[in-house]
Amino acid sequence: MSFSSIVSKFLRYLEIPAKNRTAVNFLRNPDLQPIKSANQTWGFWSNLAYWGAVSFTAGTWMSGSAALSVGLSYPETIVSFLLGNVLTIIFTMANSYPGYDWKIGFTLAQRFVFGIYGSAFGIIIRILMSIVNYGSNAWLGGLSINMILDSWSHHYLHLPNTLSPSVAMTTKQLVGFIIFHVLTALCYFMKPYHMNYLLIWSCVATCFAMLGIVIYLTKNAHGVGELFTSTKSTVTGSKRAWAWVYMISYWFGSISPGSTNQSDYSRFGSSNLAIWTGSVCALLIPATLVPIFGVISASTCDKLYGKQFWMPMDIFDYWLTNNYSAGARAGAFFCGLCFTMSQMSSTISNCGFATGMDMAGLLPKYVDIKRGALFCACISWACLPWNFYNSSSTFLTVMSSFGVVMTPIIAVMICDNFLIRKRQYSITNAFILKGEYYFTKGVNWRAIVAWVCGMAPGLPGIAWEVNNNYFHDSGIVKFFYGDSFFSFLISFFVYWGLCVFFPFKITVRHDDKDYYGAFTDEEARKKGMIPYSEISEEEIRAYTLGECYTTGHEYKPESSDNESPELIKTSSENTNVFEIVHQKDDEKHSFSTTQQVV
């Protein structure tokens, strides 16, 4: 057997089973199609829990430690976080509309903006961010697992470290990390739109756990401690102002990967009102309160124990080490269980499933959401997440770097949706190679240029954040401090300007029929589409299931006044290829385009 035949056989083995995919090509996958209206079940509480799960985590709890690096007082840091939440709401909700309007996820939205081939650019960046975020969340999840195991066994609490001193983790931490990965991997066998119940329960449980910790510490310390109220800002004047800007930018940067792929989950919403109210409440209330809880706990611990414990896991480790009582063990178990649930919910929704959706767009023939999520879990080890939490400055660097890369993508997507396309997209054209979103050789170079222009000025700032001795250019540093503002404006207006001076032709505004069952009959008619219930099963198969590409069936839809797509069969030796020919006439002009369907 030749090497090429071995490779071909291996690739066929890796293909998604035929029952789980609709067509054998690089553009189609069931996970990429719009969500059917029956699965759009996320109401207010589900949307609140989706973003609430991000806040009710150990990472958000300890985020107040960032104030140590920039010199702001803790009250100032909390206010800057509140302003950062407002910025996050603006960017996130503006970037939600592809999911609102057309029930599609981030992957198809990237095809609309960056092109059929160019979409890989934004998708790969989002995958890389998810992998880093996955490792970070999983590490904290492993520490939460250890809270549970510590409460079960005094021996495990004092488990000897058998790893090399040069490794920034212990044997016990490694055990918890592995267990968390295994438990999380089991959740990838459910559909993303079914995990809203896990999100809701984890938010409720962790909220009560956090409240319990803060109330207990505050009661024993007879107040919130002097650290919270008396800590003064160590910077003044313009440095203080830029520190404010930095904390606002950092706060959005830490959440920017989730804001970028917001349409992945906004498409599950039962109504726009539920999406708006749930998301806004979550991004305002828990996202502001949880950092306050973290600061209060560190302040009270400093008064009670002479140490500032920023991680809730460290608090319970201290309690169990000094008093392995039944009460301490019960508290460690239940709080550890709650934090484990919250870390799992955040990791699964914002990292695992997000990567699965993205990879399904890159390699739909070989990867579905489940496989992509498991890949993300495996590769997340490579980013060495145990190094992220060695110091507050390292944590800050990791979190702030997300925004430098992701904010320009958000800016381009928002500009394209509102100013260029006017919130009108053709879903079927996202599965057509040389169709509406082919642009120039499959790439919208305008979007690429706009992203580079917004991203590049922030890269030196990341290097400076890692090592302040690289250079002392205050302009570069200040740009990095306000990157979330500056990069957004640069990319937004560069893309808009390029589209004005180098326009591309928009020939298809939106589909004339709801081929994917994404809307109710009433919603479809409001959008000027023929409802799914009024389309023949034969036509639905032709447009969505790809049946005609394997059976050789030829389908010709009925013509309409405005547009008459005609499915024409052309043959090659081994393959049947179909083309959709669009013909449109009005009083001012007429044109026809031929688009290859794959």
UniProtKB/Swiss-Prot annotation:
Induction: Expression is controlled by the transcription repressors SUM1, HST1 and RFM1. The modification Phosphoserine is found at S560, S572. The chain crosses the membrane at residues 48-68, 71-91, 112-132, 174-194, 197-217, 241-261, 273-293, 372-392, 395-415, 447-467, 484-504. It is a multi-pass membrane protein. This is Nicotinamide riboside transporter 1. The keyword Transmembrane applies. One of its GO terms (cellular component) is plasma membrane. It holds the Pfam family Transp_cyt_pur. Keywords: Cell membrane, Membrane, Phosphoprotein, Transmembrane, Transmembrane helix, Transport. The keyword Lipid biosynthesis does not apply. Coiled coil: none annotated. High-affinity pH-dependent nicotinamide riboside transporter which also transports thiamine with low affinity. Involved in 5-fluorocytosine sensitivity. Its main location: membrane. It comes from the Eukaryota. GO terms for biological process: 5-amino-1-ribofuranosylimidazole-4-carboxamide transmembrane transport; nicotinamide riboside transport; nucleobase transport; thiamine transport. One of its GO terms (molecular function) is 5-amino-1-ribofuranosylimidazole-4-carboxamide transmembrane transporter activity. The gene is NRT1. Belongs to the purine-cytosine permease (2.A.39) family. It is found in: Cell membrane. Gene3D superfamilies: Hydantoin permease (1.10.4160.10).
